Amino acid sequence: MGDALIRDAAVLRDIAPADAAICAGLARAVGWPHRPEDWEMAIGLGRGVVATLGEEVVATALWWPYGEHHATLGMIIVSPEHQGAGIGRQLMQAVLAQAEGRSLLLNATVAGQPLYEKLGFVVCGAIRQYHGEVTAVPVPVLAGGAALRPAGLADLPVLEQLDQAATGLPRGPLLRAVLEAGEGTVLMRGGEAAGFALLRRFGRGLVIGPVVAADLTDAQTLLAHGLQGRQGQFVRADIEDGSPLGAMLTAAGLKPVDSVNSMVRGSLPRPSGPFKRYTLASQALG
């Protein structure tokens, strides 16, 4: 079937939780490690579309609203057999219509970036993925009277405040979902929360993120604490390309792998600071 016939035959519909297992298989076909559980979380937090040919799901695209003015896009996949037929553009146009009126953020694969540029996205940064088995566990250094304690659901209001100060986005549902799926740590200083890190199962092992802190030292402390007891386990972290955290992750046994360009269509969110997001929840969710 020619590209035009494939494009015309593709039927788009809203993605549903029941699609999670099928989407995980599609992700594996393009080398992505996402489990059905990872898809269930992503679908539950956002909206999106799938493209079908007959009964077969051949492409996906999702988006996640953060407040009234911004959203992130991700999980944009076209099966290898149907790439180049224009289905990716159809999907993107569908999610752009769903998210109309919002400024949009995404992390672009090399293959996807030309399409996103044609749709009005511009590069605004880069993210580097580190992953691997932990071989050396760094010791957390508690500076300036800091202390660490476990995070619970009762901490969500303050975690949301720190996260919004770091990202400029209200991401309460995301933080709740990540904490419910895993565990977290709060860095305390002077009786107040001064940073946090969340960790959950994802893909081939564990992912540490988001990590939010006021400075690099506190971020390193939270990251080191998250690696405690993880020797021999597969861990992933997504950080800004060129971040000093890369040296720490490499020393722990994680290796730098692919990088992606961060892109925006519209206006960037405006973090109020002084907090900063040092690792992502995922490249799709931000």
Task: Locate each region found by the language model.
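Intrinsically disordered, low-complexity, positively biased terminal segments
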Residues: 1-6, 16-17, 21, 41, ...
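Basic, Lys/Arg-rich alpha-helical nucleic-acid-recognition elements, primarily the DNA-binding modules
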Residues: 14, 28-44, 51, 56-86, ...
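Conserved catalytic-core motifs of GNAT/GCN5-like acyltransferases
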Residues: 103-107, 122-136, 256-268
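Conserved active-site tyrosine of GNAT-family acetyltransferases
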Residues: 116-121, 249
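Surface-exposed beta-loop interaction hotspot
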Residues: 124, 129-157, 162-163
